[in-house]
A protein has these predicted regions:
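Glycine-rich beta-to-alpha transition loops that act as phosphate-gripper elements at the mouths
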Residues: 22-23, 28, 98-106, 130-131, ...
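Conserved, mostly hydrophobic/aromatic
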Residues: 20, 39, 47-50, 116, ...
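N-terminal small/glycine-rich loop or linker at the start of catalytic domains
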Residues: 5-27, 60-62, 66, 87-98
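Active-site-adjacent beta->alpha loops and helix N-cap segments on the catalytic face
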Residues: 1-10, 53-63, 72-85, 104-110, ...
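Hydrophobic faces of well-ordered beta-strands that scaffold small-molecule active sites
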Residues: 18-22, 47-49, 95-99, 124-126, ...
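Histidine/lysine/aspartate-rich catalytic loop segments that bind and position anionic ligands
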Residues: 146-182
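Catalytic cores of alpha/beta
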Residues: 29-41, 156-167, 208, 212-224
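Glycine-enriched alpha-helix->loop->beta-strand junction motifs that scaffold or abut catalytic
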Residues: 43-45, 116-122, 142-149, 166-172, ...
Length: 224
């Protein structure tokens, strides 16, 4: 089942799905697996497995530290793909690769997408790859049935959102605020308005991220 169909099926029984995040190899892969066991037991629907990178430009200090510590411990891309395969075979939630374009560039876009597919992943999030430079990667992804997750931001014009919407597959990631991950987002009508703006330009499911950190945040978004 594709990512969009999976989300729509899950939403028949839940008015809000949960997407969680793990930095591969931090503090260790065994700890990651324990975290994922808890996530599965508490009903998480989608998990991003972040492949650590030395310059994680979209991430805040906590995530930067996690990336650095994982790399210092020797985490490799191959280990991350092996772990993704273990996770996708063990749990029923959908798994996404989250990382930076350098990973795809260094191994080649075709191999990158194929490795995600072979590891049981449903898609990927590469926040540093502009949609204008992603046509080949997206074409390869479509051939393999892997979804490129597009980011829509509050600073994007409607014209820009329309362009992003045309490229969206599986789901889009609405960035709740300007800045980097890991900091608190103050839930307000601005976030709801962003979701409404995104909805005008895409028919795929919308996930909201960056600083969603509490039940109160999720309750605020419920039904939006």
């Amino acid at each position: 089942m594709g990512l969009q169909a999976y989300i729509e099926e899950r939403k028949k029984d839940k008015d809000l799905l949960v997407m969680a995040h793990v930095v591969c190899g931090y503090p260790s892969f065994s700890d990651n697996m324990k975290e994922l066991e808890i996530m599965a037991a508490t009903g998480v629907d989608i998990v991003e497995l972040q492949f650590p990178f030395s310059e994680p430009s979209a991430d805040g200090p906590l995530f930067v530290k996690a990336n650095e510590e994982s790399l210092k411990s020797g985490t490799t891309v191959d280990q991350c793909f092996d772990f993704m395969k273990q996770v996708s075979e063990r749990f029923s939630f959908k798994v996404l690769m989250m990382g930076y374009y350098n990973t795809a560039f260094r191994m080649g876009e075709e191999l990158f997408v194929r490795r995600i597919k072979e590891a049981g992943g449903s898609g990927y999030i590469l926040p540093d790859l502009p949609v204008e430079e992603s046509s080949n990667l997206h074409a390869v992804s479509e051939q393999e049935g892997i979804e490129p997750i597009i980011l829509m931001t509050p600073t994007s014009s409607d014209k820009r959102l329309a362009k992003l919407g045309e490229a969206s597959r599986g789901m889009v990631y609405a960035v709740a605020r300007k800045g980097v991950t890991g900091s608190k987002t103050n839930m307000s009508d601005d976030v709801i308005q962003l979701v409404k703006r995104c909805r005008q330009h895409t028919t795929v499911p919308i996930g909201v991220g960056f600083g969603i950190s509490s039940k109160a945040d999720m309750d605020f978004l419920r039904g939006s």
